[in-house]
Amino acid sequence: MSNKIIIAIDGTSSTGKSTLAKRLAKKLKYLYIDSGAMYRALTLYAIQNKYISKSHFDSQKLIEDIPNIHIDFQYNQQNNNYEVHLNNNSVEKHIRSLKVSNLVSQIATVGELRKHMVKVQHFLGSKNGVIMDGRDIGTVVFPNAEIKFYLDASLELRAKRRYKELIEANYKISFYEVLSNIKLR
């Protein structure tokens, strides 16, 4: 029997949930799962299949496609991190774009999609020694997690964190675009 537990890190967007979770997972040698990345991967799938754009969202088509969508996390030895994979392809670099950021909240509000994602998160969390971060992780997904954290920060600090992350990933974007996006989320 394993002594490893589920650790849930919850909070508002761009507060450092993933940074804390990754560091803690490395230190404890736990599996790290970024639930926000899962929703971003689902959003990327919807964009690639033209189910969603700024002007339309065909949630029914996306729901019908659920059996064809496989999201998981695989360890990348080169960068010493777990990366989100969509249908066996790493999409880590693609899911952080502003386009995905601007559409992910629409995906997350569809009840049937949320139910499916929670089911996948429960499956991933059933493995011993998991640290999962994201909104609602400690309240909805794993309300009985052995350890739970909640992170929050000012709007400006959250925008600064996200802006720095995007600039480091070579996205061409202004701070005010990021700030506006964070306000919406």
Protein language model annotation of sequence segments:
Residues 18:
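Walker A/P-loop
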Residues 1-4:
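Phosphate-binding P-loop
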Residues 7-9:
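Hydrophobic anchor at the beta1->P-loop junction of P-loop NTPases
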Residues 130, 146-150:
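Short, well-ordered beta-strand core segments
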Residues 14:
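Walker A (P-loop) phosphate-binding loop of P-loop NTPases
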Residues 25-34, 48-53:
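Post-Walker A helix-loop "phosphate-sensing" segment adjacent to the P-loop in P-loop NTPases
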Residues 38-129, 156, 160, 168, ...:
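ATP-dependent small-molecule kinase phosphotransfer cores
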